[in-house]
């Protein structure tokens, strides 16, 4: 099966923050939409709206899903209020209480790992579904599975400890979409099955190399892959090289 990699300005590229370090102060990461909304694909109701770096808004059927909303509520003012909010980890480029408090979350369910839920204000308690790695929950007809995300390299293991954060697989009306979160090419990723769209991180030193990301994608063979969570710099994450490696491995 040939993997489609939409790497062009008309498709999804999440441009990362330009800081040299992984910034935990989200005030230094004002989210901006770097490109226009991606149109729905024929036969699919899944629409992608990049915000910045690891954050995005997805429209899927009648549902609106926010992924790791940070950068201030103003970055989301043009979108419908969320039905689902997925939070992957505790770091400031994935989780920001001030942004959440500024959003209209009155009808939203928040899906998060325990490490995130523990940091949420009590006002959100009734809205939160806590998922550990391997657990799942159905909301609005969408099944959300929590997938492990963690580092493998010895020098990077403290960045993302196994069991703390979640990647997610969402299943809805026959489609399956994977969000990797901050991870390396772990066995749990490589063993995924029947993924229609995969959103794969790749940036050093916090996640994985372009080569490892491409190799993992070739292993689990999603129908389509979108690189995200990278810094928009070829010395950190070369998306053209990623596309070349995936195409070569998938030939």
PLM features: residue spans?
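Sec-dependent signal peptide recognition
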Residues: 1-8
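C-terminal motif of bacterial Sec signal peptides marking the signal peptidase cleavage site
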Residues: 13-16
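Cap/insert and terminal regions of metallo-dependent hydrolase folds
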Residues: 18-21, 184-251
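Core dinuclear metal-dependent hydrolase active-site scaffold
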Residues: 23-80, 130-193
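Divalent metal-coordination and catalytic microenvironments
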Residues: 58, 89, 96, 144, ...
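Active-site metal-binding motif and surrounding structural segment of the metallo-beta-lactamase
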Residues: 71-118, 194-199, 221
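Active-site environment of divalent metal-dependent phosphoester hydrolases
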Residues: 73-75, 91-95, 117-120, 135-138, ...
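Helix-loop-beta element that forms the nucleotide-linked donor phosphate-binding surface
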Residues: 120-130
């Amino acid at each position: 099966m040939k993997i489609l990699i939409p790497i062009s300005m008309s498709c999804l590229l999440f441009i990362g923050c330009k800081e040299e370090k992984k910034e935990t102060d989200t005030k230094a990461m004002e989210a901006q939409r770097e490109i226009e909304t991606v149109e729905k694909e024929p036969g699919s109701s899944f629409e992608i709206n990049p915000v910045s770096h690891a954050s995005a808004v997805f429209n899927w059927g009648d549902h609106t899903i926010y992924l790791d909303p940070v950068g201030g509520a103003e970055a989301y003012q043009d979108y419908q209020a969320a039905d689902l909010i997925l939070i992957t980890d505790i770091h400031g480029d994935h989780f920001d209480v001030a942004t959440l408090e500024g959003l209209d979350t009155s009808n939203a369910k928040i899906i998060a790992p325990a490490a995130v839920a523990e940091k949420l204000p009590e006002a959100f308690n009734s809205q939160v579904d806590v998922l550990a790695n391997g657990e799942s929950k159905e909301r609005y007809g969408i099944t959300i599975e929590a997938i492990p995300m963690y580092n493998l390299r010895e020098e990077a293991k403290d960045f993302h400890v196994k069991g703390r954060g979640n990647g997610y697989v969402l299943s809805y009306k026959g489609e399956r979409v994977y969000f990797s979160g901050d991870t390396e090419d772990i066995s749990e990723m490589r063993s995924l099955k029947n993924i229609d769209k995969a959103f794969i991180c790749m940036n050093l030193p916090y996640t994985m190399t372009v080569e490892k990301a491409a190799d993992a994608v070739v292993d689990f063979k999603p129908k389509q892959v979108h690189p995200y969570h990278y810094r928009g710099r070829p010395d950190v994450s070369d998306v053209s090289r990623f596309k070349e490696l995936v195409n070569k491995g998938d030939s």
